[in-house]
C-alpha cells in the first residue's frame, strides 16, 4: 500500500501540469452557391432602373485633364468631345497669359445635361507645359495638382462630420497630346507618362493627325506603342486592371490597335453630301471629324464617354486614390493626415517599455 501511494500522487501531479486539450475553433463554412430557378418575378433587375433614377437626380462628376505643348488643338478637341465650349482656347487669353513662364493649372467647371442626366464636368488645362527652352521636370506641378485633389478628398473622407456627398475634384482622365512628328516620342513625353501613369489614368492621343498620311499615321502609332512598351510605361486601360476575360479581350484590342488615338478636332460645321458635319476645311476637301476613314476621333469619344467613363472613375477611386490614401494613412500611423481625431496635431507617441520579469 505504501509503495502505491507515491505513484498515485505522481499521477495526480502530472495530470495537474498537463493542460486539457483545447477544442478546435469552429471553421466557418464557405457559402455555397446554388443556381435556383425562380418560380416567378421578384424584381432583381429593377436595380438598374433604380440606379439610373438616382443618377438622374444627383448627376455625377467627371474631371478631365488635357496636357501637351501649345498649338496641338487641346481645347478644340475637348470642345468637340463634349459638343460645347467647355475649354477656353489660347487665342482668347490676354496677351500676358499667352506664354506662361511656368506650367499653370486652370480648371473650369460646367454642367452638361443630356437625356435628363447631369454631368458636372471640370476641364483642367495646363498652359505652359512643354513650351519652355528648359522643360526639365515640368510635369511636377501637374503631379502635385493631382495629388492635392486626392489629399482634399481624403481629408473630407476621414472627417468625423463629413459631408453626405463629398465633392469630387480628383482627375479621372488625363489626355496626353503627342506632337504628330511621325518620328519618335520626345524625352519629355516619356518622362511625363512614366511619372503620371502611376497616379492618374493617362490616355495618349496623336494630335492633328490630318498632317500625316494614312501610312505615316499607322507607322507612328506602332512606333509610339513600341517605345512605351520598351520604357515600361503603361497607359489606360492597364492590363493588370482587367477584371475578366471579356474586359481583357476588349481592352487588348484597344491597347494593340487603337492606342494612341490619332485625332482631329473641330467645332465648325460644313455641308457634306446634304449633311451637316463637324470638320476641318483643307485645300483637298473637308476632313470629317467623326468619319473613321478620316481620323479616330469617334473611337476616342466612344472610349472616354460611351464605354469606359464609369471605369475611369472606378480605377481613379479604387486604384490611384486608394494607393495614395493607404500611403498617407500608413505614414501617419493610420490617423488623418497631420491631425488627431479632434483636429489637433498629435505629439509622437513615446515607446512603452516592456515590463521586466521579477
UniProtKB/Swiss-Prot annotation:
Phosphorylated by PKG on serine residues. Phosphorylated by PKG on Ser-91. GTP binds at residues 68-75, 102, 208-216, 265, 280. One of its GO terms (molecular function) is molecular adaptor activity. Residues 125-128 are annotated as: G3 motif. One of its GO terms (biological process) is protein localization. Signal peptide: none annotated. Brain-specific, with highest expression in the hippocampal CA3 region (at protein level). Gene3D superfamilies: P-loop containing nucleotide triphosphate hydrolases. GO terms for cellular component: cell division site; microtubule cytoskeleton; presynapse; presynaptic membrane; septin complex; septin ring. It is found in: Cytoplasm; Cytoplasm, Cytoskeleton; Synapse. Residues 68-75 are annotated as: G1 motif. CDD domains: CDC_Septin. Residues 207-210 are annotated as: G4 motif. Residues 1-29 are annotated as: Disordered. Residues 1-10 have a biased composition (Basic and acidic residues). Septins polymerize into heterooligomeric protein complexes that form filaments, and can associate with cellular membranes, actin filaments and microtubules. GTPase activity is required for filament formation. Belongs to the TRAFAC class TrmE-Era-EngA-EngB-Septin-like GTPase superfamily. Septin GTPase family. Filament-forming cytoskeletal GTPase. May play a role in cytokinesis (Potential). This is Neuronal-specific septin-3. It comes from Rattus norvegicus (Rat). The lineage of its organism: Eukaryota, Metazoa, Chordata, Craniata, Vertebrata.
Amino acid at each position: 500500500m505504501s509503495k502505491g501511494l507515491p505513484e498515485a500522487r505522481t499521477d495526480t501531479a502530472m495530470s495537474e501540469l498537463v493542460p486539457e486539450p483545447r477544442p478546435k475553433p469552429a471553421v466557418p463554412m464557405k457559402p455555397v452557391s446554388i443556381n435556383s430557378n425562380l418560380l416567378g418575378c421578384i424584381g432583381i433587375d429593377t436595380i438598374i432602373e433604380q440606379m439610373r433614377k438616382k443618377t438622374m437626380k444627383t448627376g455625377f462628376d467627371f474631371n478631365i485633364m488635357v496636357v501637351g505643348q501649345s498649338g496641338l488643338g487641346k481645347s478644340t478637341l475637348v470642345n468637340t468631345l463634349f459638343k460645347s465650349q467647355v475649354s477656353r482656347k489660347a487665342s482668347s487669353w490676354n496677351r500676358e497669359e499667352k506664354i506662361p513662364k511656368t506650367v499653370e493649372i486652370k480648371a473650369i467647371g460646367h454642367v452638361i445635361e443630356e437625356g435628363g442626366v447631369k454631368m458636372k464636368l471640370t476641364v483642367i488645362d495646363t498652359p505652359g507645359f512643354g513650351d519652355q527652352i528648359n522643360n526639365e521636370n515640368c510635369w511636377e506641378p501637374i503631379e502635385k495638382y493631382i495629388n492635392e485633389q486626392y489629399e482634399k478628398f481624403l481629408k473630407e473622407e476621414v472627417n468625423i462630420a463629413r459631408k453626405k456627398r463629398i465633392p469630387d475634384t480628383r482627375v479621372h482622365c488625363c489626355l496626353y497630346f503627342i506632337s504628330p512628328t511621325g518620328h519618335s516620342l520626345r524625352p519629355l513625353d516619356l518622362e511625363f507618362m512614366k511619372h503620371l501613369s502611376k497616379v492618374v489614368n493617362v490616355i495618349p492621343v496623336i494630335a492633328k493627325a490630318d498632317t500625316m498620311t494614312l501610312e505615316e499615321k499607322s507607322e507612328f502609332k506602332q512606333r509610339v506603342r513600341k517605345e512605351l512598351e520598351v520604357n515600361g510605361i503603361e497607359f489606360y486601360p492597364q492590363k493588370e486592371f482587367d477584371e475578366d476575360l471579356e474586359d481583357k479581350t476588349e481592352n487588348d484590342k484597344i491597347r494593340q490597335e487603337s492606342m494612341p488615338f490619332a485625332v482631329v478636332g473641330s467645332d465648325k460645321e460644313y455641308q457634306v453630301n446634304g449633311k451637316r458635319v463637324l470638320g476641318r476645311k483643307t485645300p483637298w476637301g473637308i476632313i470629317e471629324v467623326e468619319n473613321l476613314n478620316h481620323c479616330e476621333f469617334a473611337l476616342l469619344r466612344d472610349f472616354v464617354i460611351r464605354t469606359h467613363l464609369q471605369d475611369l472613375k472606378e480605377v481613379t477611386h479604387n486604384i490611384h486614390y486608394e494607393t495614395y490614401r493607404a500611403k498617407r494613412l500608413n505614414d501617419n500611423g493610420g490617423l488623418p493626415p497631420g491631425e488627431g481625431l479632434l483636429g489637433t496635431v498629435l505629439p509622437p507617441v513615446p515607446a512603452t517599455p516592456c515590463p521586466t520579469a521579477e
